[in-house]
Regions:
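N-terminal membrane-targeting hydrophobic helices
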Residues: 1-174
């Protein structure tokens, strides 16, 4: 899958649970690919794409480890969750992802019918984003706290800001 789709899936699914952890999950969702580049930079050896950095078992174990032991503000869990969303999204593709370093079996979801860059990839990822928007709007009340999207009209109505500040920021999303 393309990075934009990995970022969309990890960001949307994380925003429902913990909006403040979206940047960490986005860093984690791109990690399986940039870890390949980092390994090559550090050691000089190239590893195969969707190889050692794409082991499903490693990302699941990392997430379980962070969820069961002390994790400072769930930063580690968000990072490994982002990586796990990357692995799960790559499992939709024809190539699939390896289960573990000791297994030759590749993991596929829904038969692994997607090809990277084709329309099916975008339909699935943006469908997940749409579902997350619906779920998020259903479970959150109006005026809830979203750290990256400010409710300027609500702030003005409650008297928190004055009219000039509202006019200056009313069309600002972030």
């Amino acid at each position: 899958m393309k990075w934009i789709n990995h970022i969309a899936i990890a960001g949307a699914t994380t925003a429902i649970v913990a909006p403040t952890l979206v940047p960490v999950a986005v860093a984690g969702c791109t990690a399986p690919d940039w870890l390949e580049w980092l390994y090559k930079f550090v050691t000089g050896n190239k590893i195969r794409h969707r190889g050692a950095t794409h082991y499903l078992s490693a990302w699941v174990l990392g997430l379980v480890f962070c969820l069961t032991l002390y994790d400072f503000h769930h930063i580690g869990a968000a990072f490994f969750y982002g990586g796990l969303t990357h692995i799960m999204a790559d499992s939709f593709t024809v190539m699939g992802v390896p289960l573990s370093p000791w297994s030759d079996t590749r993991f596929h979801l829904f038969g692994g019918r997607l090809r990277t860059g084709e329309s099916g990839e975008y339909l699935i990822s943006w469908g997940i984003v749409g579902i997350c928007i619906l779920v998020g709007s259903f479970f959150s009340s109006y005026g809830g706290w979203y750290p990256f999207f400010y409710d300027w009209a609500g702030y003005y109505e409650s008297g928190m800001i004055d009219a000039s500040e509202w006019k200056a920021n009313r069309f600002r999303l972030i």
